[in-house]
Curated annotation (Swiss-Prot):
Ranges where the record places region G3: 392-395
Cysteines paired by S-S bonds: none
tr-type G domain location: 337-506
Keyword annotations of the record: Cytoplasm, GTP-binding, Initiation factor, Nucleotide-binding, Protein biosynthesis
Name of the protein in question: Translation initiation factor IF-2
Organism: Pseudomonas fluorescens (strain Pf0-1)
Compositional bias ranges of the Basic residues kind: 231-244
NCBIfam families: IF-2, small_GTP
UniProt-annotated location(s): Cytoplasm
GO cellular component, one term: cytosol
Keyword GTP-binding: yes
Comp. bias intervals (Low complexity): 137-171
Region described as G4: spans on this chain: 446-449
Amino acid sequence: MTQVTVKQLADEVKTPVERLLQQMREAGLPHTAAEENVTDSEKQSLLTHLKSSHKAKVEEPRKITLQRKTTSTLRVAGSKSISVEVRKKKVFVQRSPEEIEAERKRELDERRAVENAARQKAEEEARVRAEEEARRQPAAPSAPAEAVAAPAPVAEPVREAAPVVAAAPAADTRKRDEQRRPDKPRADDNNRRGGDGERKNAPHRASVKEKAPAPRVAPRTTDEESDGFRRGGRGKAKLKKRNAHGFQSPTGPVVREVKIGETITVGDLAQQMSVKAAEIIKFMFKLGTPATINQVLDQETAQLVAEELGHKVTLVSDTALEDSLAESLKFEGEAVPRAPVVTVMGHVDHGKTSLLDYIRRAKVAAGEAGGITQHIGAYHVETERGMVTFLDTPGHAAFTAMRARGAKATDIVILVVAADDGVMPQTIEAVQHAVAAGVPLVVAVNKIDKPGADLDRIRSELSAHGVTSEDWGGDTPFVPVSAKMGTGVDELLEAVLLQAEVLELTATPSAPGRGVVVESRLDKGRGPVATVLVQDGTLRQGDMVLVGSNYGRVRAMLDENGKPIKEAGPAIPVEILGLDGTPDAGDEMSVVADEKKAREVALFRQGKFREVKLARAHAGKLENIFESMGQEEKKTLNIVLKSDVRGSLEALQGALNGLGNDEVQVRVVGGGVGGITESDANLALASNAVLFGFNVRADAGARKIVEQEGLDMRYYNVIYDIIEDVKKALTGMLGSDVRENILGVAEVRDVFRSPKFGAIAGCMVIEGTVHRNRPIRVLREDIVIFEGELESLRRFKDDASEVRAGMECGIGVKSYNDVKVGDKIEVFEKVQVARSL
């Protein structure tokens, strides 16, 4: 017998000696020291104690797992063999006799309960049927009296039908019992495992099967048949059939609440209405609008579709991010007076920039291309009466959007009208912009030093458009000025500052900066540059700004003279560098707390703008499909347009898209801010377009492609020139018209016969000149009866090339011999005339 010491045993089982001694004392062993010996029987006693303390079962394992593996070889074509290995695994669980007995008793009790319930139900049905027959008995007097005792034969069918009727309740009862005791193994499990439960439960199932064909007491219904009450059916199948799930069609239309944002795709709309997308597409086809599952619908179209299909529509605004941004921008602080923002507006060449030059003591107008302003210029001027910020807007008709933007960003509008020119179209437009923006007007009647200046005529013309002078009882100051001589400029500034005092303009310098983009451009060395007018708060270098759908950190700020500054307060125009793109003029600028918020809102705005643009473009295309059917395709002049600033690009696109007619049109296939690059040249090459550069030039790569491919590239610095050239190009695309000019008219006085030419008309030329080999018309009583060619023209037997008015001649008409006296022969020519827009 092998003996080891307590210490050796502790080392062997990897436990401390003290811990092992304590466990041995708990097991009832007499060991107290590490040097004492431990016998095998003592080890067994210790092991038994440890197992019992850990609640381990010492009996034999109740679960046995058998695994079997067979390998076979499968031969395939090409003398190849594949080895196939099949593995099988079976688990046998030994059940205790107590569990088997309890299961048998439980099933016996259940069966007795089911039989009792079935017997009671059968007796109740027999009693009801007997009462029915008893009530019907008096209505048939011919029936024998002993028929009243009809309930007697009921007893035998009750006994035989009971097990059959009980099949479904038995399944329900068993199911409830299994739910109450989920840890008990089911009889079906025993069938699969092949345990003792199969042998014990088999007789009970067989007894139900044997009685199944018994006649039914009550007539079968459709529900009973669907629940598995069929003759000879198996209990398990009945249970599965009874528990099968299914969908029932709704008894009426289901009205759903559909939430529609600014845009929604056809697929998303169908999902919200719980219908197939094909139904919506089919409905839109009925409305005359072809659609696809991924097509973006605008809010109005989606609302119409949903309401027509009978659903309730809730319009929602996808502005959660915008609302949270607006909440974060709220700031309370002390408001202080600020300088007014004044926009100078008026017709082209009426002296707006010259007036500003005199106020600023600068020479801006002299350096402008063509002598006209083509950008919005922003300046702030320190005067004796305080600081004023001026916005100089273009006066050309193409810059309508710029002037509208200037009116929105301003406090006061100076309307410049030339005294010698009067009220012009852009003057009226400027008045409309100011009235729409609710901005007070100050009228500056410029060029008052010129002869022929008539101030009363200006007052009269403007009063017709709702601008009445203070001298005539209105509320608009009229100040006569001369930008050249400086006359009346001080009075003009005084009138502007007086209006500013009435408006009580205030701002909060301690708040985060907020403003509007006046202009933006792409500088080759500095990247996107935006001219921003700060309207409230203070903009500082290093601030994270969100500008429309662009964002970035302000890396540098420059004033209007190009000098770097660190911060800009209210009503100060500055140029900022550091944005990730060129924002659109008119976009709002705001300082945000962190870059994450700015990026989220910028990406949201970009996606929203793209969806709305796609929806509108697609709607426009679909509307034009049916209009253009059967018509000739328009000739299109494709243009790739690059400009120096965003505002000029918008103005040019608007002006060019407005050109054209039913036969020709302009399509700007690409546009942007900055120089002409290689990608622009490739786009022009692919789309067969003309390259236009407005105040920009092409780089080396673009010039190389233009030379190799022979592209048409033109530079401009005046907007008039672009519009004129495009008009000429469109005129050339129109082709030419054929016009007829009547050369002469001859009256037939007599008809002769010639063997060579047939009928010869002796004529007197009464109008113009008759030429040989020209087309003619024969008119009888001023009605055209023949159109052909003059074959022979003679005068006194001599051939003549032409015969003038008042002279006689002989005319032979080719292929026509029905000339009569009194007819008129009209000689004409066809001339091609160039068309114009």
